[in-house]
């Protein structure tokens, strides 16, 4: 994956640097969720909706791994953005309603939250 690279990366870098309004570059997919910076801008790469590649930092290696398909949800609001990376997997739902009520109560009283 890393050996593939981006052809004419210098051209893209020049475009981004000359357009400071570009705050996020979104791409996909590379079979792994990846975030990096490029030309002083955030880059977010979506995982595959099919198989994923095993996380291996040696670019000469590479193998598929049994991880669920993934997706990204990007939310822009004014000049800010948030990216959520999720997986397509039907996990067991956990009831956190009591904890959420506890946190909300502490927030309403302007109190800290114990982490023990």
PLM region descriptions:
Residues 2-7, 33-37, 43-46:
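A broad, low-specificity signal for short, low-complexity segments enriched in glycine/proline
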Residues 12, 26-27, 71:
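Broad hydrophobic/π-residue packing in well-ordered secondary structure
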Residues 22-37:
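Active-site environment of divalent metal-dependent phosphoester hydrolases
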Residues 1-23, 54:
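Active-site-proximal segments of metal-dependent phosphoesterases and phosphodiesterases across multiple
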Residues 15, 37-116:
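Binuclear metal-dependent phosphoesterase catalytic core
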